[in-house]
Amino acid sequence: MNLIFQKKSYSFKLSAKVENSKTNYHTKSGWIIKLISNDKKIGFGEVSPLHKKALKKCAKQLDMIPEYIEEFNLSEQINIFHPCIQSAINSALAEIDGKIIFKEKYYFDEIGKTAILLNHENVVSDLNDIKKRHCDIGKSLTLKWKVALKNNHEEEAKLEEILSKIGNNIKLRIDANGSWGRDIANRWADILKDNKNIDWLEQPLCVDDIDGLTELNKKIPIALDESLLKFPTLIDEWKGWQIRRPSQENNPVKLLRELENKKALISISTSFETGIGKRWLHHLSSLQLQGPTPKVPGLAMNKFPNSFLFLNEAKKIWDQL
């Protein structure tokens, strides 16, 4: 299949800063790519790197792709490229080939349909505000708390306060972004192992400490995130929860097939994509919720500005860029 390859860059400012123990995000940049087949079928993809170093690498590699290229040659060329480029190209090819068919509408706009990221600076007051706004009708909510941003003594005190304030209708995900050592991680695991509000501890130890993560997973559900990106073979080996970010994996079609085949213990998470990448997030999240271990995705819905970049129609986004 002969293809026309096109790309356009984008940049936007998040409506609120997102901070974790490793970095923080104020703005997001990337590219929308468009593939047109010789029979006029169109596929869109999004190159959505999270870090500046990766952004520079992707810029150089995207410039190496010619405007006119055969599908086999394109697939061969991107094998050595950054995973975000591979993800975008494979996403667009999947759309052209009919491997994924997006719905006109997905239903993740309501607050309870996605995990809510707590403000780590004012975590207790933020929790109280959320409860006032959303819990008076008894709906289930899932909260995510980024930890390892303050000293552990202070965060343990906050944990105790949080646990005293949440009822059975609130689930909690605690994400250390790989910044704890084994002592602190085991301490939190011991505190939380019998707590029914906890969905999981997310990447509590550094990406390389697979033995430590495996031992922790025997005490309490552990969800791998960054470890999966560094060691993709863990996707087939890890027996616990997996935080999957399709725009960061080299081929989201693999994730699509896993969810279609009802693979358990997968949770879908954003890397702050535009509406192009969001189509994949919403489609995969819908499949996940129909699977054996349904969990609301982490889509950071309240962090995006009001912009055409987040429309549900790929063509409109492309035309306005």
Specify the residue positions occupied by each region the protein language model found.
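Shared catalytic-loop signature of beta/alpha-barrel
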Residues: 71, 206-209, 215-221, 226-321
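General beta-strand structural signal in soluble alpha/beta enzymes
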Residues: 7, 45, 172-175, 202, ...
